[in-house]
């Protein structure tokens, strides 16, 4: 039996007392304007899944704790929410389902993934994202309750994983603890998987940024351009694009 199964009766009222609109207001505008498919990993009491459903989205709520899952189904009986027992780092059922999502939320979850399993977990999350999809994580700083299975997290680690998988940083925010614990604080991170209109760009970015053949000058050039684009505030101006096109023609 997990710590969350044992603590469910005490945790659920505390979770439900937090207003999700206030908790997630820092990234609310990044969600699809039209109804989409959203995955809530570590859905807990279903508070956030229910909020996302009221915004019109179809939500898959993944919660491995049976006690938390049962409470969530009781408190939020919404036909737009589909519950599953899937958990990181495997997410086996979701990966086998063939589903993909416009947004994936990990709210107060990443600290439960053991450090040695995070690269694998991140790769599987990215597999579930649609091109153009949004990934939102909150990172916990502060002492962990005894027996909760929490591990230290860092923004730098998440940023490195994002670069390795071709995700673009969209927003970062320092957040207070909504339960009023002075010793606990949070960092919110929003990332997006680029979309070239064909669905091929995420794969190409991953190959270009991680291929071991660093001696090929064309691959090196592409890698440099992608890393420069990762750090740019926006797309090049039309004049800059024309200059790049002219230079590309000279190199061919």
What are these regions (language model features)?
Residues 108-109:
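Short catalytic micro-motifs in class I SAM-dependent methyltransferases
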Residues 1-39, 44-96, 113-120, 124-127, ...:
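Class I (Rossmann-like) S-adenosyl-L-methionine-dependent methyltransferase catalytic domain
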Residues 105:
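A conserved beta-strand element that flanks and buttresses the S-adenosyl-L-methionine
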């Amino acid at each position: 039996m997990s710590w969350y199964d044992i603590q469910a009766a005490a945790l659920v009222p505390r979770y439900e007392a937090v207003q999700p609109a206030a908790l997630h207001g820092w990234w609310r505008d990044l969600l699809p304007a039209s109804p989409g498919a959203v995955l809530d990993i570590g859905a807990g009491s279903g508070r956030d899944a229910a909020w996302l459903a009221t915004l019109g989205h179809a939500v898959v709520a993944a919660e491995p704790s049976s006690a938390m899952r049962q409470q969530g189904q009781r408190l939020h009986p919404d036909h737009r929410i589909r519950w599953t027992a899937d958990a990181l780092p495997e997410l086996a059922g979701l990966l086998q389902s063939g589903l993909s999502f416009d947004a994936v939320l990990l709210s107060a979850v990443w600290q439960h993934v053991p450090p040695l399993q995070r690269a694998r977990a991140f790769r599987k999350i990215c597999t579930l994202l649609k091109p153009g999809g949004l990934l939102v994580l909150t990172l916990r700083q502060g002492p962990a309750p005894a027996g909760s299975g929490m591990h230290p997290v860092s923004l730098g680690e998440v940023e490195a994983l994002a670069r390795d998988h071709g995700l673009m940083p969209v927003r970062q925010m320092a957040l207070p603890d909504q339960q009023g614990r002075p010793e606990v604080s949070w960092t919110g991170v929003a990332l997006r998987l680029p979309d070239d209109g064909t669905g091929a760009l995420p794969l190409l970015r991953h190959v270009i940024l991680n291929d071991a053949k660093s001696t090929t000058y064309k691959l090196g050039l592409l890698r440099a351009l992608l890393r420069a684009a990762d750090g740019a505030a926006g797309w090049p101006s039309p004049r800059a694009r024309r200059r790049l096109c002219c230079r590309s023609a000279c190199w061919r």
